[in-house]
Amino acid sequence: MLIDHKLSNLSKIVNCDLIGNDAFFEKVSTDTRSMAEGDIFLALKGPNHNGHDFINKALDKGASCLITEKEIPGETYIKTENTFLFLEELAKFQRLNFKQDVIAITGSNGKTSTKEILYQLTKNFFENKEVFKSPGNWNNKLGLYLSLLELNKNHKLAIFEIGTNAVGEIKELASFLKPNIGVLTNIGNSHLEGLKDTQGVLEEKTDLFSFVSLKGTCLMRAKEKHLQKAEEKIKKRKKIFLQVKETQSFDQNLEMAEAVISCLPKLKKNNFLLSEEYINFLKKKAVVPGRQELLIGKNNVNLIDDTYNANPESFRAAFKKIKSMSCKNKICVMGKMNELGEKTLLLQDEVIEDALSVFDLVLAIDLDSNIKDENFKIIDSKAIYKNLEIYLNEESVILFKASRSVKMEKIVKLFK
């Protein structure tokens, strides 16, 4: 954090009393599974779990202090009326006191990969551990707050990912974060259940630009028809618009990352050329588990694990990657796409038709579809291995992709 790690300093930020002895702490943790000795345990209440139920476990793991909504006799603790609002106040303090460049990345696809590429590139211009990136896909309100708590005095640059699945969420996150660089990777058919259509996605995602500092820069990759809406929110801020291209997603994410670097005052004077070797290194670093991850499975079959999430655009990005591969047999195993609303069946069938133009066989697990094709089958998940057994060899590539709730990563394990 951006303060000396003493409990008394923490309690002053949120104007709460510290009960017990003052002491030093390592960090604030909300999960007893990952916390270490000396951490503070913040007992959050969520829809599925109540952190107060894990207080004894936190103490067993050596928590230096508890932040709770109830008294804990005999222990060192800070009592607050609402632990989530306590977290919010800490996050607000962190943001107000972080005076370095802050980058916020959103978009229908490519947020995490762009963040990873940008992180690897910017590290070259700073000393060790001076660039911060939000962990994993911590892109909702809770994730943003927890990410902000990890900022410390050594950081010279911070890169955050923010997401949405309902109207107003980007506005809420961006107004809290107040970045000086805002990045919109693309506009696509994502979260239509909450955002209705691509126009709703455009309206929601471009809200980021309204909260970029007035002297900051807004970067966006979008079709010509989407630029007017972006301009309305960018106003007099600097802007960089990148064209939508028929290239693989990595190339587009790399181009965006390079454009961001050109906007950073500390870095833009540094010209650098990326060798083929370094680009291959970036490709490996940009791979997030479950996102176009190439694996070698049973009998040397090529597996593409893209099971983390799915929408029509991310399906097509995966199709492009596999189209360029020289394997004899190309198979797509797909599951449902969530949050597409009333257009689910239509968009799903469009994706299936696109898949049939690339793959020799398309297997859909528990999907509804109007598509009739000899190379398309709707099957039960229990029948997947039987249908693919003959393709388990080095001449085959199998793509596995679906929305997160399908848990298709369990199916991928059958073929590893």
Positions of PLM-derived features:
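ATP-dependent carboxylate/acyl-activation modules
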Residues: 105, 289-291, 405, 409-411
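Active-site beta-alpha connecting loops in nucleotide-dependent enzymes
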Residues: 48, 288, 299, 307-375, ...
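N-terminal leader/targeting and accessory segments in enzymes
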Residues: 1-89, 93, 323-328, 340, ...
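Generic hydrophobic/aromatic pocket-lining and core-packing "Φ" positions
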Residues: 55, 170, 205, 209, ...
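Buried hydrophobic packing segments
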Residues: 87, 118, 122, 147-148, ...
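Phosphate-binding loop of NTP-binding sites
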Residues: 8-14, 86-217, 226-235, 386, ...
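A glycine-rich beta-strand to alpha-helix segment
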Residues: 388, 392-416
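Acidic, Mg2+-coordinating active-site environments of NTP-dependent enzymes
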Residues: 68-74, 181-303, 324-328, 353-361, ...
